[in-house]
Swiss-Prot record:
GO molecular function, one term: DNA binding
Annotated spans, Disordered: 1-22
DNA-binding region: 67-86
Function: Positive regulator of all genes within the pca regulon, pcaBDC, pcaIJ and pcaF. Also required for the chemotactic response to aromatic compounds.
One Pfam family from the record: HTH_IclR
This protein's name: Pca regulon regulatory protein
Length: 291
């Protein structure tokens, strides 16, 4: 998502067009129906609820949407969607090319305050900083949010940044990331197959594993060994290793990883030098959180 120059909301409303296969499917239990359930509440702000629903209509795989597509996904009338988008543009949260709309990085600030202040993120930050200082690479923590991973804490040395540089609140697809596969490995087999059946599995590089059966076998291996390396599957040149963070009952709560460039760190070094540091940090953090 690039930071683009804001343009005015198109003056002419988009003409109606029939729903097609190219249009994103409506969200189950649509926002419009959930909003309608509060019509009897005099303190409920329908306009605010609609604005939030419009923001949530955008996904990693649907970054550019038309008014018709957003209306289809949310079941909110097009006129209301248009007003929401106009407001988001004026406030610096969205932009338009005259037909499609996309969110701007400023929208991440809406969730940053919460994510960075959760007990897990607060407790994890010193460990991430220590890992980053020790290994001179970016250290991250994420949870599973729908079909994506959601970054909840991060520490990165300025001189080592690579193009995949997500701030707290950023998202990436779970299937092709080391933290994502750790979190997917915590699912039972039925839930995992359901995920692989609905997720948009595509080759982001020539090395991306995107066949459902191959991914299922890979994630089962991750589950058995307790850690995961993803080597240039998300982005050419990007290599990462991840481990799980457990809660008091032994369930996977989040994932912790270090990402690096292939020109700096070999896969063997990831496993021999980075992995013990990550496992120790995971163990110490779990002990701090749950005793």
């Amino acid at each position: 998502m690039s930071d683009e120059t804001l343009v005015n909301d198109p003056v002419n409303p988009e003409p109606a067009r029939p729903a097609s296969a190219a249009m994103a499917p409506p969200i189950v239990a649509s926002p419009a129906k959930r909003i309608q359930a509060f019509t009897g509440d005099p303190d409920f702000m329908t306009s605010l609820a609609r604005g939030l629903a419009v923001i949530q209509a955008f996904q990693e795989r649907k970054r550019h949407l038309t008014i018709a597509q957003i209306s289809h996904r949310t079941e909110i009338p097009r006129a209301a969607v248009r007003r929401c988008l106009h407001t988001l543009i004026k406030l610096g949260y969205a932009t338009s090319d005259g037909r499609t709309y996309s969110l701007l990085p400023k929208v991440l600030t809406l969730g940053h305050a919460y994510l960075s202040s959760t007990p897990l993120a607060i407790s994890a930050q010193p460990y991430l900083d220590r890992i980053s200082d020790q290994l001179h690479e970016a250290a991250n923590m994420a949870t599973l949010e729908g079909d994506d991973i959601l970054y909840i804490a991060r520490s990165a040395t300025v001189e080592r940044l690579i193009s995949v540089d997500l701030s707290v609140g950023g998202r990436l697809p779970a299937y092709c990331t080391s933290m994502g596969r750790i979190l997917l490995a915590a699912m039972d087999d039925t839930s995992l197959r359901e995920y692989l059946g609905r997720a948009d599995l595509k080759a982001r590089t020539s090395r991306t594993l995107h066949d459902p059966e191959s991914l299922f076998a890979c994630i089962q291996q991750v589950r058995a060994q307790g850690w995961c390396v993803v080597d240039q599957e998300l982005e050419q040149g990007l290599r990462s290793i991840a481990v799980p963070i457990y809660d008091a009952s032994g369930q996977v709560l989040a994932a912790l990883n270090v990402s690096t460039h292939v020109g700096r760190v070999t896969r063997s070094e990831l496993e021999q030098r980075f992995l013990p540091i990550l496992l120790a940090a995971s163990r110490d953090l779990c002990h701090q959180l749950f005793g």
